[in-house]
Amino acid sequence: MKPKDLKSPFKWEHRQIVIQDRVWYVPDQHLSDIPFIFPGWTHDQTFAQDKPIYLEYCSGNGAWIASKAIEQSQYNWVGIEKKFDRTRKIWSKIKKFELDNLLTICGEGFHVTRDFFANESVDAVFINFPDPWPKKRHAKHRIVQPAFVKEIHRILKSDKLFTLVTDDAAYSKIMIDVIYQTGGFISLFEAPYYTTSYPGYGSSYFEELWREKGKSIHYHVFRKI
């Protein structure tokens, strides 16, 4: 099925939180009179099978997470992407490859995490090529903020890994600083706390794009302590 085949289950003036056809919609407001109750990860609406949850933020068009769901079917994969046009592309891949171990969430990462993920419920977290918002006046829009890192620490199981990937050297340093200042994590790499070679990690649209432009990719891996 093509991305355009996915239609929103509600009109904007009647937006609501709903899980439908491998997509979990989390708009900025829930305007239904019926409260949303998350059914759990083993419900038919989500995964049915009880497997470790691997969570990706900034999923983009879904190339990375779809390939991971195919290669590593022993995990349940969740991709969070706030833009509906990109969510459609992830959904299209779910349908094309019949991925019953991949669910996409269309919503804002921090609020979705805070409102719907239980303590120590996730086995791995990935953030691939988040928008660096390089201008100082836009810094508040960056996903890697102290409050967000605290939420990742809360939902991640003990000793599990938090991986971040960027092509932006300045943002790499910012993310490292935020994580260490927030606390609760330790890098798997010695200073400068990243590697530019991480075989087997997988590729995405942005990774291929920036490599073609000659950019170096920074991989950061932190363990929850």
From Swiss-Prot:
Catalytic activity entry: guanosine(46) in tRNA + S-adenosyl-L-methionine = N(7)-methylguanosine(46) in tRNA + S-adenosyl-L-homocysteine
EC number: 2.1.1.33
Entry-linked InterPro entries: SAM-dependent_MTases_sf, tRNA_(Gua-N-7)_MeTrfase_Trmb, tRNA_methyltr_TrmB_bact
Binding site for S-adenosyl-L-methionine: 56, 81, 108, 131
First-level EC class: transferase
Domain of life: Bacteria
Gene Ontology CC annotations of this record: tRNA methyltransferase complex
Pathway per the UniProt entry: tRNA modification; N(7)-methylguanine-tRNA biosynthesis
Coiled coil: none
Residues binding substrate, per UniProt: 135, 167
The family this protein is said to belong to: Belongs to the class I-like SAM-binding methyltransferase superfamily. TrmB family.
Protein name: tRNA (guanine-N(7)-)-methyltransferase
Organism: Protochlamydia amoebophila (strain UWE25)
Organismal lineage: Bacteria, Pseudomonadati, Chlamydiota, Chlamydiia, Parachlamydiales
